[in-house]
């Protein structure tokens, strides 16, 4: 099809979203349906996640707009859709939200490349074919900055950085393709940091990365738990999922956001040590006065009692000692006056801890065999999705 955009008809938006029914994806869909009662949302769903998606779709009936599930996969030509389905999207879609990606740190490079880079290329093809496209919203990650230290600006991408894992590397290459496409497409890029549970309820579908610090503290039978890996002075930048959804929805409809990149981060993050101390206080634990070096922490993580962390999760804990400061000037500028602002972690940390504690308590009640606190994660879904494959993104 031609890349020439036709003028969008004066109707409610028609949305296409990848990464459903994952952690962020399902919340974004619900937000769209509530905020725009006349909207029609197409959600791309992998076959293995169709049942879960159908259950969620049934719960969302009556919330406002309409949700239509399309079975497919971003790695396939035309996203695995039939010719009729693909043509329907091309004729109707006004907004695309591309969330699906593999984020699991231990994923083989070929798999990560196929999903994160080739999958993004396929979504770009759809965007070029959409006759009424108003916006392609791409979910990247702050971690495309790799091993860079210091202040990192939103308009920076390729600064000669090295990458610590294939997730960072493949998301970097995917964003490069997105940025090149922005010359001819109305694109907005979002780079969230680590997304945690809802700031009001603490609810989250997955426990990974920084959450493992909290889980080890909350559920540890030891009065004095494991010391914090490293000195803990680096900022632990996390954002609640409800903030991410509201910010993305608002910015994706702001014409000033076209062609720009937005760090979805806490503008004033707490240090990793302070977060660890606050969680310890809530768990009635006394922290050791000494720190572990990164190497000593890695050795301790290999002990049998902690082996459930596994190599990918040990790698994730390395982020707590990474002194990167993500500037969010663009985000603050465009959200100014909207009432949407990332809440400080201190204001909702108690809810996150309480949710972890309650999930662990319920898990222990369901099975007396569960002795390992790190066994409490539910099976991964798809926008963080996948099981046979490693989890896919947001």
Where are these regions (language model features)?
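N-terminal Rossmann NAD(P)H-binding glycine-rich loop of SDR-like oxidoreductase domains
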Residues: 8-38
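Amphipathic terminal alpha-helices
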Residues: 14, 36-39, 327-394
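NAD(P)H-binding glycine-rich loop region in Rossmannoid oxidoreductase-like domains
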Residues: 67-118, 128-130
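Conserved Rossmann-fold NAD(P)-dependent oxidoreductase catalytic core, especially the SDR/UDP-sugar
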Residues: 97-99, 106-114, 118-166, 188
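A conserved pocket-lining segment of Rossmann-fold NAD(P)-dependent short-chain dehydrogenase/reductase
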Residues: 108, 201, 210-243, 247-251
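Active-site Tyr-X1-5-Lys
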Residues: 125, 149, 161-193, 198
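Glycine/proline-rich active-site loop of Rossmann-fold NAD(P)-dependent oxidoreductases
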Residues: 198-211, 251-262
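Terminal hydrophobic/aromatic helix or amphipathic segment near a protein terminus
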Residues: 272-322, 342-345, 361-371
